[in-house]
Curated annotation (Swiss-Prot):
<comment type="similarity">
    <text>Belongs to the RecU family.</text>
</comment>
<dbReference type="InterPro" id="IPR004612">
    <property type="entry name" value="Resolv_RecU"/>
</dbReference>
<keyword id="KW-0963">Cytoplasm</keyword>
<dbReference type="InterPro" id="IPR011335">
    <property type="entry name" value="Restrct_endonuc-II-like"/>
</dbReference>
<keyword id="KW-0227">DNA damage</keyword>
<keyword id="KW-0255">Endonuclease</keyword>
<dbReference type="GO" id="GO:0005737">
    <property type="term" value="C:cytoplasm"/>
</dbReference>
<keyword id="KW-0540">Nuclease</keyword>
<dbReference type="GO" id="GO:0000287">
    <property type="term" value="F:magnesium ion binding"/>
</dbReference>
<dbReference type="GO" id="GO:0006310">
    <property type="term" value="P:DNA recombination"/>
</dbReference>
<dbReference type="InterPro" id="IPR011856">
    <property type="entry name" value="tRNA_endonuc-like_dom_sf"/>
</dbReference>
<dbReference type="GO" id="GO:0003676">
    <property type="term" value="F:nucleic acid binding"/>
</dbReference>
<comment type="function">
    <text>Endonuclease that resolves Holliday junction intermediates in genetic recombination. Cleaves mobile four-strand junctions by introducing symmetrical nicks in paired strands. Promotes annealing of linear ssDNA with homologous dsDNA. Required for DNA repair, homologous recombination and chromosome segregation.</text>
</comment>
<dbReference type="Pfam" id="PF03838">
    <property type="entry name" value="RecU"/>
</dbReference>
<dbReference type="GO" id="GO:0006281">
    <property type="term" value="P:DNA repair"/>
</dbReference>
<keyword id="KW-0233">DNA recombination</keyword>
<feature type="binding site">
    <location>
        <position position="119"/>
    </location>
    <ligand>
        <name>Mg(2+)</name>
    </ligand>
</feature>
Amino acid sequence: MTIRYPNGKRYNQASQPHKTPIKKHTYSNRGMSLEEELNETNEYYLTHNIACVHKKPTPLQIVKVDYPARSAAVVKEAYFKQPSTTDYNGVYKGKYIDFEAKETKNKTSFPLQNFHLHQIEHMKQVIAHNGIAFVIIKFTLFDELYLLDAKHIIAFWNRQNTGGRKSITKEEIVEHGSLLSCGYHPRIDYIRVLDTVYFS
């Protein structure tokens, strides 16, 4: 169909240059992060009435917000209200559980600088009140996960503070920790290890 102007001339649509979509490099399909895997695991435990464990929210003080559109708000500036303690907490078989999740690309050790003093103090307090505190450590290059009781983390932290090494060797983690199995549902079955280590 030909379209014409009132003066009879033909309308020629201005040819617009063909835009090739810019490919965005995404790494989302390379694998889930440890946090995502644990969140999925905890969702599985909750929906199957196995345990009630949640990720703790990070307490933030929002200072500046921009509104580029009416329905969108973009936080431009925020500060931590207080130091966060550990990543996850909840209840399993009537016991309070509290744990931190850490990843490392190191092959032979886990650096203690990944912990902060307030996290160590928090784990000590959990243990003092008969709670269960532990750390899940992932060696990403080997795709291996270990559950390590907080008493060992505290001992290694104290060793560091008395002039000892500033990391935990992988051999020490293998010796004192428990290897976690990964699957489909749940993704990281840490409850099975809790049953063996704390409830047997």
